[in-house]
Amino acid sequence: MVAKVTAARRVSCADENRTPGDASQATISAAPEDKKQGFPDIREDGVARGVSASCGAVQNAASAQVPGARTPGVIGVPVASKTVEEARGGGAKRVITKRVGGVFVLDDSAARPNRKAGNLASGARLSRFSRSDRQRSDGFSGTQARANAGGVRRGEGRPFARDFSRGSTGGYRPAVRGPARPAGRVGSGPRGPAPLQVGAGKPAQNKRSFRGRKQQTYQYQHKDRLELEEKLLQQKKKNKEKLAAVPRSVEIMESVSVADLAKKMNLKASELIGKLFGMGMMVTMNQSIDADTATILASEYGCEVRIVSLYDETIIESVGDEHAVLRARPPVVTVMGHVDHGKTKTLDAIRSTRVAEGEFGGITQHIGAYAVSTPKGSITFLDTPGHEAFTMMRARGAEITDIVVLIVAADDGVMPQTIEAINHAKASKVPIIVAINKIDRADANPNKVMTRLAELGLAPEEWGGDTMYVSISALQGIGLDLLLDAIMLQAEVMELRANYGCCAEGRIIESRIDHGRGIVASVIVRRGVLRVGDTYVAGVYSGRVRAIFNDQGEKIQEATPSMPVEILGLEGMPNAGDPFQVTDSERIARQISLKRQELRRYENARNVKRITLDKLYESIEKGSVSEFKVIIKGDVQGSVEALKQSLEKLSTDEVQLRVIHSSVGAINDSDVMLAAADSNVTIVGFNVRPTPQAAVLAERERVEIKKYTVIYQAVEEMERAMEGMLKPSLKEVVLGSAEVRKVFKIPKVGSVAGVYVLEGVMKRNAIVHVVRDGIVLHSGKVSSLRREKDDVKEVHSGFECGVGVENYFDFRERDRLECAEMKEVSRKLKDAALSDAARLQG
């Protein structure tokens, strides 16, 4: 319906007799002088401000579309009263908010619903007003209900000023029975009419629907937490399903904690603890058990235990080569042989360099990697040490190689390290090419070498075998081309190929600390392409490739398979022979690195010797064991490892050599302070020197620093130092011998032998053995020694004397007396080792 405002003074319906449903228009008029009486304001433009009208039949009124109106849902004022005062009595209220042409439009969309509606259930509202003569509730509650019921008494003649859009304000007086009064706070002065409520006439929602809305709101506000709880619940269900299935086999290291073993076997740790308790072991879930115990425990569940290494436990899955395009790669050739048989000299002749001249003692003490270009292709050579101390280096060289070139001197023949190199090559299942060197020597005998090697399983092709032999002279440059041809021929037969499109993988050949560049690692790339910026894991450390250098020291951007390079950017010093692998992200590399470091610390802690009561009693019975403590510092990791193993081999049951610290780099202040903490620590520097600060500190703290450039010199000197710590052995030394010529009976003393000194000397208080017919009858001490009637200390050969032996009187003529004494003799470590072995066999 449409309400039309004119200049009339009174409100009248167009047709007072019409039904509410037929009412269409109502005219509202106001004279200017009526404004003083509190009637609605009408501005100069004709727009009424705050005009409020109501009719009792709002719910049944028909709505009419206003021409030109833009807001939907607009209704007119129902015709139900003759005056404004009567229209104010009750019913739904509407607010005139805009003007369309000459018509004021009543818009109910701006009114806000009563927030207190729905707080009471329908039954509660009815029961609340059941005894009152007030009209029954129409579905509203709170302020809305009071307003509908007539409001509260206010100042006489004040307009209807309650604004329900502002919420409850409090301070209302009790309701007064009688004609309807406007609701609102107590105050003075005219106030504008209140806006109409949206949803007028609708009953309040019941309490059940209100609780439903609260639950929906709670779920929306706590959506993330509820989703997380749901995920945890699903994961818990999955874990319960997993616990039911015990795998057929698990992989562990040499020792494993009960919790880790239970996790691998999909069991609860408490269950394994109960099993161990039944086996007589009191353990906790974080306590470690050895591999044998874990095997017995797993066998009860039908599970097999496999022992794996540190890197197998944290293996990085790599892309397979099944669907990749493989390309040819250069062969990796390791040169092996006995010391001083000409390995480095042969490589120098091939590369036209002089590396051997710059080596201390003329021997190689670390692995060198070189790339050589030939007319038929490129070859990567690895030069390994031949000294006995570098066994691990030779083993690593055989592991990462494709072909082994065995250098044997024609004059020396097969030596111990030659046999060891053959065993390493056979263990790695790589082909061997024998190069007989020094054929220019006059005493060279190649046939003897071939015969001895054939006995070891390396039969020459000329003799019907499958081993290629090449006679060379590195000094004269003879036969080197034939050696290169043999290598390339063997490589063609092997069809060496690699995947160039995957993440780079390889092996650490050597690692060291370079002044100004930090930690430098020599790497052989086995597959993939290594580029600057790649993240990787080397051993137990992660890093990012900052720079790559080839064997000539030139900076390059990438390294292809079989290429020996040096890389920068490691977080720690990896061990020689550790695996090297590029990862997809730095996060993955760091996670693997932290896990491997944790496993290594755990493994090192397991290797620490713990003192038990049995060991304590045993050490007390043996006496205190001397310890020779050393700190080893070297130029490269491989040399440090070789020196450490060589020195630890010197230990015996009486003297133990203990390496308390070993690392790569110069001798620094920390090393000196560590040695100063114990008075019996020696610092051994191999191809390194102390820093100026460390040298001053060592002199002040009186710490001994030994510097060596050749490994066997260091081993020999440490051996002599340990021999000085051995307790000297007592050795019987024969002083002389005498023959019994006559026996004298002396009262209260016993028998005394009159002897003739045949050789040497007879001494008082010396040891004497009584020998008859080659059998020692008695060994005792010379209690008295007389020459005629005088007591003497010693009698030399050619003289006669009287000899009394302590607690022995059964002398006979022709008996032989041997005089001896015990002397301390310094011992050798080899003798101590032999005595230890004999004691163990006994």
Curated annotation (Swiss-Prot):
Record field: compositional bias (Basic and acidic residues): 32-41, 153-165
Disulfide linkage: none
G2: annotated segments: 362-366
UniProt region (G4), positions on chain: 437-440
Record Pfam families: EF-G_D2, GTP_EFTU, IF-2, IF2_N
Residues of the tr-type G domain: 328-497
Gene3D superfamilies xref list: P-loop containing nucleotide triphosphate hydrolases (3.40.50.300), Translation factors (2.40.30.10), Translation initiation factor IF- 2, domain 3 (3.40.50.10050)
Residue ranges, annotated region (G3): 383-386
Stored InterPro entries: EF-G-like_DII, IF2_II, IF2_N, P-loop_NTPase, Small_GTP-bd, T_Tr_GTP-bd_dom, TF_IF2_bacterial-like, TIF_IF2
Location within or outside the cell: Cytoplasm
UniProt region (G5), positions on chain: 473-475
Family annotation (PROSITE patterns): G_TR_2, IF2
CDD domains assigned to the protein according to its UniProt record, in alphabetical order: IF2_eIF5B, IF2_mtIF2_II, mtIF2_IVc
Keyword Lipid biosynthesis: no
Annotated region (Disordered), positions in chain: 1-41, 112-219
A GO term for molecular function: translation initiation factor activity
SUPFAM superfamilies per UniProt: Initiation factor IF2/eIF5b, domain 3 (SSF52156), P-loop containing nucleoside triphosphate hydrolases (SSF52540), Translation proteins (SSF50447)
Source species, domain of life: Bacteria
Entry's family note: Belongs to the TRAFAC class translation factor GTPase superfamily. Classic translation factor GTPase family. IF-2 subfamily.
Function: One of the essential components for the initiation of protein synthesis. Protects formylmethionyl-tRNA from spontaneous hydrolysis and promotes its binding to the 30S ribosomal subunits. Also involved in the hydrolysis of GTP during the formation of the 70S ribosomal complex.
Protein name per its UniProtKB record: Translation initiation factor IF-2
The species this protein was found in: Treponema pallidum (strain Nichols)
